[in-house]
Structures are given as structure tokens and as C-alpha cells.
């Protein structure tokens, strides 16, 4: 993979050493065996970003149950991050238990494609989900004006981990799909023999589903 190209889904997350509010971190190696969500925000001490950090903090234990860590990032300084965290903890009564990367020169943000035309001096709301092998599994970009749906990020991680475990694919709005509820879809058959074995199953040989345990 080119050193300058933005990492894509299915590729290894690029190796880098970053400075955070919890010290230096080597990505992705320091999270080997764990998933992590790296998310960028436009700036400290801004209303939408504050609501996002509050929500991430409130949902932190749900991420932990999925063997997943959180890492924030913006082009603010480490001092700014620390002051903002202290303000959140004092005024909103919630602890920020995860590190925030300080990237004042924007090197990490540029490497990960977090600087868009909307602003050349701040990051958009990007999300990278990286699995326990250091592979990028999901990339999301939100404009600055729209706060992220933290429950959707959790849903996507649950779906990805189920896909890995059970060898299935998940339908729209899983686990609340309008057609099959919390069931999952079997991958497409690879041979004519496999296709014929599925004849008569709902909905058809190319679209079959089943129940799986999610725990």
C-alpha cells in the first residue's frame, strides 16, 4: 500500500505513533487482539463535538463488551484536549475514559483522509473501525454539521463480528429488518449443487436466511 494513499476497507491500518491525552500510542500494534474505533472531530469546545463525546463516553461500556476501544482525534493541541476533557467531566458529570490524539500539524488527519474541501483547517467527522488483526473494516464520513449516531457504530461492529464468527451477511437495519427480523442471510451459493440444495427454501435459492446466536 502506498504510504500516501488513504487506507481502504480490507487493508491494514497504517502504522503510526501518535501523541494522545493518555500518552504515546502505536497504531495499530498497541491494540493487537482488540478492535478500535478511531473517530475525528472538527474541534474542541464546540457544541456538536461535545454531544458526541458525551454519547461516546456514556456508551463506552457497550464498546468494551465488544472488545472495542475508542480513540478520538482532532487538529487541536494536547493541552486543548485536556482542558476540554476537564470541562466535560466537571460540567456534564461524565468521564472521558478513552485517549484523544493531538494532531496540530494535521499529519494524521491528512494520512487518513480526514481533511475535506469543507475546511482545510479542521477534520470532518470521520470514523475508522479496525478489527483485532489491525484491518480496516468500516469507514464513515459525516459533514461537520451533523453529529454521529453512536448506536449505528455499535450496530455495525456487532454485525461485523457476527459476520466473522458465523460466516453470514446481515440485512438492512439488522437486527430489526422489516422482512426477516433479527435473522441473517446465507452467503450466495458457490456451486450449482449448493444452489439446488436451497431450492424450496424461502425466499428462493439465491436468498435464504437463518437464525444465529449473537452471544
UniProtKB/Swiss-Prot annotation:
Can you tell me which residues form the catalytic site?
Answer: 49
One GO cellular-component annotation of the UniProt record comes to: cytosol
Report the locations given in the UniProt record.
Cytoplasm
Q: Which Gene3D superfamilies match?
A: Antioxidant, Horf6, Chain A, domain2, Glutaredoxin
Record keywords, A-Z:
Antioxidant, Cytoplasm, Oxidoreductase, Peroxidase, Redox-active center
- Assigned EC number: 1.11.1.24
Entry's Gene Ontology BP terms: cell redox homeostasis
Q: Show the catalytic activity.
A: a hydroperoxide + [thioredoxin]-dithiol = an alcohol + [thioredoxin]-disulfide + H2O
Question: Binding positions for substrate?
Answer: 125
User: Where is the Thioredoxin domain positioned along the sequence?
Assistant: 7-162
Q: Which CDD domains match?
A: PRX_1cys
Give the molecular function GO annotations.
peroxidase activity; thioredoxin-dependent peroxiredoxin activity
One Pfam family per UniProt = AhpC-TSA
Question: What enzyme class is recorded for this protein?
Answer: oxidoreductase
Sequence similarity: Belongs to the peroxiredoxin family. Prx6 subfamily.
Q: Relate the assembly described in the record.
A: Homodecamer. Pentamer of dimers that assemble into a ring structure.
Q: What else is known?
A: The active site is a conserved redox-active cysteine residue, the peroxidatic cysteine (C(P)), which makes the nucleophilic attack on the peroxide substrate. The peroxide oxidizes the C(P)-SH to cysteine sulfenic acid (C(P)-SOH), which then reacts with another cysteine residue, the resolving cysteine (C(R)), to form a disulfide bridge. The disulfide is subsequently reduced by an appropriate electron donor to complete the catalytic cycle. In this 1-Cys peroxiredoxin, no C(R) is present and C(P) instead forms a disulfide with a cysteine from another protein or with a small thiol molecule.
What's this chain's function? Answer: Thiol-specific peroxidase that catalyzes the reduction of hydrogen peroxide and organic hydroperoxides to water and alcohols, respectively. Plays a role in cell protection against oxidative stress by detoxifying peroxides.
Which PANTHER family does its entry note? ALKYL HYDROPEROXIDE REDUCTASE C, THIOREDOXIN PEROXIDASE
Its name, as the record gives it, is: Peroxiredoxin
Amino acid at each position: 500500500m502506498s504510504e500516501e494513499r488513504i487506507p481502504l476497507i480490507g487493508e491494514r491500518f497504517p502504522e503510526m505513533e501518535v501523541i494522545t491525552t493518555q500518552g504515546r500510542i502505536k497504531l495499530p500494534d498497541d491494540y493487537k487482539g482488540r478492535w478500535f474505533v478511531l473517530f475525528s472531530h472538527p474541534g474542541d469546545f464546540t457544541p456538536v463535538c461535545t454531544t458526541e463525546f458525551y454519547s461516546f463516553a456514556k456508551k463506552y461500556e457497550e464498546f468494551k463488551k465488544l472488545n472495542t476501544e475508542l480513540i478520538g482525534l482532532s487538529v487541536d493541541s494536547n493541552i486543548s484536549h485536556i482542558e476540554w476533557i476537564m470541562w466535560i467531566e466537571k460540567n456534564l458529570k461524565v468521564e472521558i475514559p478513552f485517549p484523544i490524539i493531538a494532531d496540530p500539524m494535521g499529519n494524521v488527519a491528512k494520512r487518513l483522509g480526514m481533511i475535506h474541501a469543507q475546511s482545510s483547517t479542521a477534520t470532518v467527522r470521520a470514523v475508522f473501525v479496525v478489527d483485532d488483526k489491525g484491518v480496516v473494516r468500516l469507514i464513515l464520513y459525516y459533514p461537520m454539521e451533523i453529529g454521529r449516531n453512536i448506536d449505528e457504530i455499535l450496530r455495525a461492529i456487532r454485525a461485523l463480528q457476527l459476520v466473522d464468527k458465523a460466516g453470514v451477511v446481515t440485512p438492512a437495519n439488522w437486527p430489526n429488518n422489516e422482512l426477516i427480523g433479527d435473522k441473517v442471510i446465507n452467503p450466495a451459493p458457490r456451486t450449482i449443487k449448493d444452489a439446488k440444495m436451497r431450492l424450496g427454501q424461502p425466499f428462493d435459492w439465491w436468498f435464504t436466511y437463518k437464525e444465529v446466536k449473537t452471544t
